[in-house]
């Protein structure tokens, strides 16, 4: 996993160049944006339990057949694994927001996840629905302007949404 700074330096070094004015300006903007990132990550981390629990409850209400007798998530062990996995995905979304890069989520969370769910008989579209529910809650929390560093957060919210979309796409 490389953060944005490391990537820019690596690219310039590969070319044998100093950082360009545009690259320095882009990194300066990233530094200015970092407080907003920290605010959002802090909010999501502080609300992680409720984000995951509410997404799980909504998923059970939406798809009871999966959680009833004979369903892929019927046993307590499977239900606990579902909650755990939603928590893992949320955690890696927060890492991605903090780094400004989703590669850590791809490398350590999403690679092979679809195949795992297929092997377990868990419908990927159900997992994707749970991820969508977390996305909706996370965006609502991140969009609350109280206690967030002043400034336009629309690009950061779009980035946050893209990490959830990436995770949802990885499981179907």
From Swiss-Prot:
Gene3D superfamilies: Phycocyanins. Keywords: Antenna complex, Bile pigment, Chromophore, Electron transport, Membrane, Photosynthesis, Phycobilisome, Thylakoid, Transport. InterPro entries: Globin-like_sf, Phycobilisome_asu/bsu, Phycobilisome_asu/bsu_sf. (2R,3E)-phycocyanobilin binds at residues 82, 153. It comes from the Bacteria. One of its GO terms (biological process) is photosynthesis. Contains two covalently linked bilin chromophores. The keyword Thylakoid applies. It holds the Pfam family Phycobilisome. It is a peripheral membrane protein. GO terms for cellular component: phycobilisome; plasma membrane-derived thylakoid membrane. It is found in: Cellular thylakoid membrane. PANTHER family: C-PHYCOCYANIN BETA SUBUNIT, PHYCOBILISOME 32.1 KDA LINKER POLYPEPTIDE, PHYCOCYANIN-ASSOCIATED, ROD 2-RELATED. Heterodimer of an alpha and a beta subunit. Belongs to the phycobiliprotein family. Light-harvesting photosynthetic bile pigment-protein from the phycobiliprotein complex. This is Phycoerythrocyanin subunit beta. The gene is pecB.
């Amino acid at each position: 996993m490389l953060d944005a700074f490391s990537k820019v330096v690596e690219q310039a070094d590969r070319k044998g160049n100093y950082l360009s004015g545009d690259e320095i300006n882009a990194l300066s903007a990233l530094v200015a944006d970092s407080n907003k990132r920290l605010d959002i990550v802090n909010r999501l981390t502080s609300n992680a339990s409720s984000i995951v629990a509410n997404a799980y409850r909504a998923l059970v209400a939406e798809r009871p057949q999966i959680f009833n007798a004979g369903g892929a998530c019927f046993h307590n062990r499977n239900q606990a694994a579902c909650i755990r996995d939603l928590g893992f995905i949320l955690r890696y979304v927060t890492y991605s927001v903090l780094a400004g890069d989703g590669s850590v989520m791809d490398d350590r969370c999403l690679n092979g996840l679809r195949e795992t769910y297929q092997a377990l008989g868990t419908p990927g579209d159900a997992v994707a629905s749970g991820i969508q529910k977390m996305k909706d809650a996370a965006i609502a929390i991140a969009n609350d302007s109280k206690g967030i560093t002043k400034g336009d957060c629309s690009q950061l919210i779009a980035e946050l949404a893209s990490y959830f979309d990436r995770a949802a796409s990885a499981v179907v």
